[in-house]
Amino acid sequence: MKLITTLLLCSGLLLTLTQGEEAQEIDCNDEAVFQAVDFSLKQFNPGVKSGNQYMLHRVIEGTKTDGSPTFYSFKYLIKEGNCSAQSGLAWQDCDFKDAEEAATGECTATVGKRENEFFIVTQTCKIAPSKAPILKAYFPCIGCVHAISTDSPDLEPVLKHSIEHFNNNTDHSHLFTLRKVKSAHRQVVAGLNFDITYTIVQTNCSKERFPSLHGDCVALPNGDDGECRGNLFMDINNKIANFSQSCTLYSGDDLVEALPKPCPGCPRDIPVDSPELKEVLGHSIAQLNAENDHPFYYKIDTVKKATSQVVAGTKYVIEFIARETKCSKESNTELAEDCEIKHLGQSLDCNANVYMRPWENKVVPTVKCQALDMTEMARRPPGFSPFRSVTVQETKEGRTVSPPYIAREQEERDAETEQGPTHGHGWLHEKQIKANKNHRGHKHGHDHGHWSPRRHGLGHGHQKPHGLGHGHQLKLDYLRHQREDGDDHTHTVGHGHGHGHGHGHGHGHGHGHGHGHGHGHGHGKHTNKDKNSVKQTTQRTESLASSSEYSTTSTQMQGRTEGPTLTPPRAQPTVTSSGFQDSDFIEDVVATTPPYDTGAHDDLIPDIHVQPDSLSFKLISDFPEATSPKCPGRPWKPASWEDPNTETTEFSDFDLLDALS
């Protein structure tokens, strides 16, 4: 039993040790990186026995590992300064030495930071004297302090003594054990001096029960931890003659039990693909199909979660999604395994409770399901369309296209006019019927076109055939609709003014609303000109109608109107839904947009004056914006010298246009 406990605790400790923060790249110009480099350089310069101090040139790469403590790993370039190593000046107070005489180097360091205090973990610098091969900065020598491997066997007695000293001289309730050796240095004197930095962690062994560490003591994942630095002197007889230690403890989370308490009657999770669930799922889907009156069988598609609990038997709780199949209950007595799921069939979200007592062959399934919401996705081709904002609303007769916005005042005005008499309907809708012989001399025009607000004309009067400047009549034929009712109703846009005389009699009525007014009386004889004009106007193209629309707006008349002013009602066209239902392909969708009441809003829209050949927006550059890289960083101090090994060539006659041509 102790062996199993030890293995479980050791595996938990191993998992804890392997879970660390990932290193992330940082900006080489970051202030925190500079502080770490400054600390490293100040630790390096005192080791220079002769010559001058070294100064920071730039940081070329760096990473950061968050945690407690935070670790910075970086590479930086150094150059020899003009201050002596024994001058006592900070390297920031020096200047670079001449390029031909200055030595350069590259340092790789790892620096930790805890509570705004830095400490060196590792640092190695390689110095290259001017015009000389790269040499190591540190040379092995007898009597010098040098780093040793953290896995060296020589450290075992030192670390053992250090841990025992900490446990015996602290008032903590639990024993601590070694977690990791971070650095170790050794110096040969009349014996050996050791300088080590290591971390410790709390174990599950209390001092009341265990006087010292033993094999059953394991580290707690959420226990207290600390960092220590020890200095030990071992004489020539390998006996510890002197020892000093300084530690900093950090409290962890609340202590947890090494092993969870057993709970035989508690629910436990089961893998959704466990073979144990095969029989349980079979009982669940059979119960669902028996209780459901759907004409087709359902089949389990996805198992989301499953638990089991030991009671007076076994209780299973399963969450799954069932989908409709192609197998009908009329042609199949039971659900077969080869029944295919219907692609557009109904889906159910189900919760099943299955109670099983195998020794009694007793199975009690209970299944509760609810239908999943099916969202109808409108089919449309990809790409941008200005009609995406037009929404489609369901009605009893079909689908109606609703504009994205309707002014409130316009809605109220339309509601009032819908109750009054009307003479027609439609947007730019034209009704034309061949003339009755008994009404050859009369022509009635009704204008109910919903034009843009500044294009509406309001008029009532007699119109004369086009000629002699007495008026003109425009007939739009690209939205023509015929209805046979015995009368000749032609929707036109007409503006007439002045007085004229002729040999016949004709009259026309034009109704519209807007800012234009038309008035006047005219008499004319209906001759073959009328027939020819009708034929000609029916053959006009859409572009001609469009150009006439704009010309009409420039000929708006002002004056007194004769007859009542009628506001045509706003009609809602109905578009029958077909196999391909998409608002992008609804014909005349532009015409479905109701007129805006700009009269009430003109004062709210400011006048924007745009200079010629100017843009009201910024163009997107053809080239990507230049982003400064994180590394290498900027030179700490602009050097007035140039590297003699680097050749610099200036191109005074280079032009970017030469490369683009």
Swiss-Prot record:
Transcription found in the keyword field: no
One GO cellular component term: extracellular region
Composition bias, Acidic residues: 650-661
Low complexity bias spans: 541-555
Any GO BP annotation: vasodilation
Database matches in SMART domains: CY (SM00043)
Biased composition (Basic residues): 434-471, 492-526
Glycosylation sites: 82, 168, 204, 242
Modification note: Bradykinin is released from kininogen by plasma kallikrein. Phosphorylated by FAM20C in the extracellular medium.
Tissues where the protein occurs: Plasma.
Primary subcellular site in the record, as a coarse category: secreted
Domain named Cystatin kininogen-type: residues: 28-131, 150-253, 272-375
UniProt site positions, description: Cleavage: 386-387
Domain of life (superkingdom): Eukaryota
Disulfide bonds: 28-631, 83-94, 107-125, 141-144, 205-217, 228-247, 263-266, 327-339, 350-369
The protein's role, per its UniProt record: Kininogens are inhibitors of thiol proteases. HMW-kininogen plays an important role in blood coagulation by helping to position optimally prekallikrein and factor XI next to factor XII; HMW-kininogen inhibits the thrombin- and plasmin-induced aggregation of thrombocytes. LMW-kininogen inhibits the aggregation of thrombocytes. LMW-kininogen is in contrast to HMW-kininogen not involved in blood clotting.
Quaternary structure and partners: Isoform LMW interacts with CRISP3.
Identification of the protein by name: Kininogen-1
Record organism: Mus musculus
